[in-house]
Amino acid sequence: GKLMQKIVGIFIFNDIEVLDFCGPFEVLSVTRVDESKRADTISPFDVKLIAQTKEPITTTGKMKVIPDYDFESCPKLDILIVPGGMGTRKLMYEKDVLDFVLKKAKEVELLTSVCTGSLILANAKLLDGIESTTHWKSLERMENEFKNVKVCKDKHFVEDGNIITSAGISAGIDMALHIVKRYFGGEVAKATAKHMEYPYMIENKRKIVF
């Protein structure tokens, strides 16, 4: 039968951290359910980039990225990924961003963040009572500003029900591999990591000391 792709939306914005969104984009777009048929098959994930407007965004480091959709034209999503970066400092307080995230949170099977993207989710009150994490430099801020969030400091990514938050920047790769595992099992996730020549994380613990 035809492969029913999961529709993944990655929120992109000015001053986004490049690897925050490119890491998960890479993982989910190179996934194959059957590694031996890689050349002849597509990913089970259809990854789309969503921004506030249809204008190109400029990342940290000045890469220009063209979104597939704006908030208004965004289709129904199965998975939402909210990355981080300097841009979140402003965006986490913007009503249209919070409204979009709240709306999508109701329809998705899986709500996820990378790095400081979790601060947007936290300010939308989506992480109240939820075990969550963020970039190591923002853990203290998360604790101080969002008293209802159960801040986790020792895991590389944290899964609580249908919400997954990850640590900083490169952690989005491991978090995305975990999404693959969650949907298609460990063997598919390992094969995806191997294809990327990326070490598959066996134990979910923070990779750096801070």
Where in the sequence are the language-model features?
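Amphipathic alpha-helical segments enriched in hydrophobic/aromatic residues interleaved with Lys/Arg
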Residues: 154-165
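A short beta-strand/loop micro-motif in the catalytic core of glycosyltransferases
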Residues: 111-112, 132
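Residues that mark the start of a beta-strand
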Residues: 5-7, 131, 162
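Short, glycine-/small-residue-rich phosphate/pyrophosphate-handling segment
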Residues: 126-144
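Extended, subdomain-level signal for the structured scaffold at the beginning of enzyme domains
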Residues: 1-111, 120-123, 140-145, 151-154, ...
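Active-site-proximal catalytic alpha-helix in oxidoreductases
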Residues: 118, 164-177
